[in-house]
Amino acid sequence: MKLTKTLLTTALLGASVFSFQSTAWADTLEQQFQQGLTAYEQSNYQTAFKLWLPMAEQGYAKAQFNLGVMYAKGQGVKQDDFEAVKWFRKAAEQGYAEAKFNLGHMYSKGRGVKQDDFEAVNWYRKAAEQGYAKAQFNLGVMYAEGQGVKQDDFEAVKWYRKAAEQGDANAQAYLGLAYTEGRGVRQDYTEAVKWFRKAAEQGHANAQAILGFSYLLGKGVQVNKSLAKEWFGKACDNGDQGGCKYYGKLNRGER
């Protein structure tokens, strides 16, 4: 059973609004930002937007990023991908990694800009080189699929590993898949199971199902139907249909 290869499992709409890190020079700015954050967390989006807009217009990168998220989601303002891109770009040009990642996503999906895989790779790379795990994972996928860059399994694995070592469950699962298939690395089922387990323990449904198959078939681990059933059950609980199917089979005493 292979992972479903969706490009952006950790895409824009999962982006969070980031809180202000206190600095000595801006007590008033800090208070205003925190007021906006409190309003946002209480779903009072219009108030948050009104507080953050003047800050963003003054060049405050985190406020610019937050406005981009609000425009992308239509929170406190009419949904507008063009405005989202505008604010993500302003924050990205100041070096804000999360904004670079989201800008890459917008180019990848053609939201608010003309679809352009090369530009998507450009912005993912900028964020990835700053150590942003989601961008590292997405850059790995772009290399694996040859989108916006020459296909290169070795580069894909390099970026998966960087993200996986930071705890990104998607990257851990994809790294496990690379070891299973011998793509960009020497085939190694034991190493594959190691990474599938890390992702599975974080609730990654596909990884849980694959770990179930590993125990069922003895790939990288000893055959253990009890553990196979356990992981299939977890995968099923998280919506994986393959996990549900094989959990049912093991319950009925089938293979």
Model segments located where?
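Short helix-capping/linker turns of helical repeat alpha-solenoids
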Residues: 27, 32, 39-44, 57-60, ...
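Terminal, low-structured helical/coil segments at or just beyond the last alpha-helical repeat
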Residues: 3-6, 29, 222-223, 227-255
